Swiss-Prot record:
This is Fibrous sheath CABYR-binding protein. InterPro entries: FSCB. One of its GO terms (molecular function) is calcium ion binding. The lineage of its organism: Eukaryota, Metazoa, Chordata, Craniata, Vertebrata. Signal peptide: none annotated. It comes from Bos taurus.
Amino acid sequence: MEEKDESEQSISAGRQEIRKRRRPSQPMVDKSQQTEVTEKKKQLSIPQSSGPKAALSIGNIPGSKLNYECHRVSSQLQQTWIKRKRVQDMADKSLQTETIAEEKKEEIKLVCEAVVPEEKPAAVEVGPEFPESVREVEVPPNRYSVQVKIDRSQQTTCTGDWTMMNFPQKEKLDKEQQTYFSESEIVVIGWPTNSFSKSKEGAQKRKSSGNIFLSEHPEFQPTTSSNEEIRRPSISRTVSISPTKKDSPVPLEDEKDVPVEVQPPAAEEISAEEQLPLAETTSEEVPVAVQPPPAEEPPLEAQPSPTEEAPGDEAPAKVEPTPAEEALSEKPPAEEALVEIQPSPVEEAAGDEAPAKVEATSSEETLLKEPLTEVQPPAAEEAPIQDTPELQLSPAVEAPAEEAPAEAEPPPAEEAPAEEAPEVQSPPAEEAPAEEPPEIQSPPAEEAPAEEPPEVQSPPAEEAPAEEAPEVQSPPAEEAPAEEPPEVQSPPAEEVPAGEPPEVQSPPAEEAPAEEAPEVQSPPAEEVPAEEALAEVEPPPAEEAPAGEPSEVQSPPAEEAPAEEAPEVQSPPSEEAPAEEAPEVQSVPAGQAPAEEPLEVQPPPAEDATEEEASEVQSLPTDEAPAEEGLGFQSPPADKAPEEEAPEVQSPPAEEAPAEEPPEVQSLPADEAPAEEATEEVQSPPTEESPAEEAPAELQPPSTEETTSEMVSVEKQPSLTEEPFITPISLEETSAEVLLPPFEQTPADEALVENVSPVDQAPKEADVLVEKLESGNLDDKPKSEEPLERDTIPKDSSGTKNEGVSFEIKGVIHIELE
């Protein structure tokens, strides 16, 4: 036991000792460790408490305990101060972080410089204030600067700059886009704001106007920005605004053409006029031009022409002047017509075209018309027509060319002046100036009144449509020249000659139509384009009316697009109205039925649209009545014309729109037609192009063409009606003219239309026309051939352009829709 105890005790003793040793040792160890830890902790805590200071203090450590302690103290003070400051600044972390870096720097400095550490101790001794102050002085500045820098860099980079930059950029982008849209929208809004479609166009013109300048030679540029540019060109066309147009457009809208155009016409006209027509044109043109519409149109046309015309029309017609002149030239050639129509330069272009066309046509038609007028000696006319058709066709197709040709031709024949003036004038002049007076003159009178100026002018306005209409109408105008005498004339003539016009128209129309129809038809193809243009034009009218009516017509146009679509749609309307007309037209349509149908439809639509539109817009009725009255049949044409006009206008609009977008609906049709037309028209110089397009149109249009032809016929008919149409045209015209698309259309259209017009007229003659159209249309009949021939040319010439143009136009159309 003892041993055990001892052992235990020993063990225990040993254990106890060990334990004791351990205990004391442990406590010692613990203390030492603890102490060390404590010191470390203190150090760490202090630095840690310093936070940033930790590093600094560490940095100081190399310097010396003094520095370290002093610094540490200072850091504590600083830290406290910093905390206060942080709280105040609320920049805790950033400040702290910066502070740490700065403090490190300071520490380094302190370490490096004993003085600094000493100072700090002194500072410490002095009190927190000194370090604080020191710190403030040194650190804060650095810190602030650093912080500022950091903050700025961070904020600026991330927050401030990005935000600001982004915002501005975003704003800019948004604004640009928005603005861009706004402009468009505004423009759109503007359209409503302006007056009717025209207003739109005016607005559009304005909108485009800047662009339009570009557009001014959109023909070239449209390609550039097919959509906008084209649209603008279209717009320009539509606007007719060549920049000048812009004003013009406004006036156009207001005046519809007269004032507006006047200027351009003058200038342009002058150019055109310059051209020969110059004097004459000037006169006439002026009259017509006066009717600025024409002028405007010139602008319109010019521009459009340039664009469009330039493209085809102008090229041909304008060909001469095309580009530069284009407006001028355009006008000049067109101008001639243009000039005289120049009044509707656009129109002119269109008109020009119309005039030219008309002129050409006119010449041609004049020939034709002359014949018409003559057809007023139909026979002569016929010959001329055919001749003209041919011419015309050429004119039509050629119209551009012809225009040039016509122009040239007429110039020769008419001598540009004659033609030109004749054309418009010529028709008048040629037309027998009497006619011209009647026609142009009369038209001027009337025309001025209704037709040519109207037509042209109106056409201008309308003319684009009218012109188109002119063309259609112009054709009417033109035709009207031809017809115009009849139509315009017709209105005059028609009015008086209504019979005759019908007759004239009829024969001419018929013949011309037939022929022309063929031609038209050919043109149909061409004309289709023309027609299409017409249709398109019609759409323009439709559209334009639609423009005013656009929807309506446009719808029709859209529908019309269908119609000629447009035609057709229009047709429906036409049909509707034209049902009656349709018959007639339809009749023609009947013959032409298929194509015609659209035609018919279209005319009806045109009529309808037009009518409504025209009526609506126009007083189509009135017009129509007259037209109808004169045309009677034509009334439908009137309707149609109006409609057509509307369509045409619409088309222009449509085209424009179409060409532009709206037309697009219309455009569709219009576009299609317009596009086509635009294309065609644009193309028409495009017309010519139209031919191509036309070809397409023709192809396409074959029916379309037919339709178009028909349409054209019908439309043309409306052209006949055109007079009424014109009236509408005036309104519409402005639009259309403004639309220019008509213009656009006009070129080809016009020629075509013109051709068609005859056809249209034919519609009066519908039967004959139908037969002829049908034959012609389908066959393109001799005329067709001729026209075709020309058509072909246009097709090729214009075709190429046409396609290009078409694309552009289409693009434009899309844009337009936007």
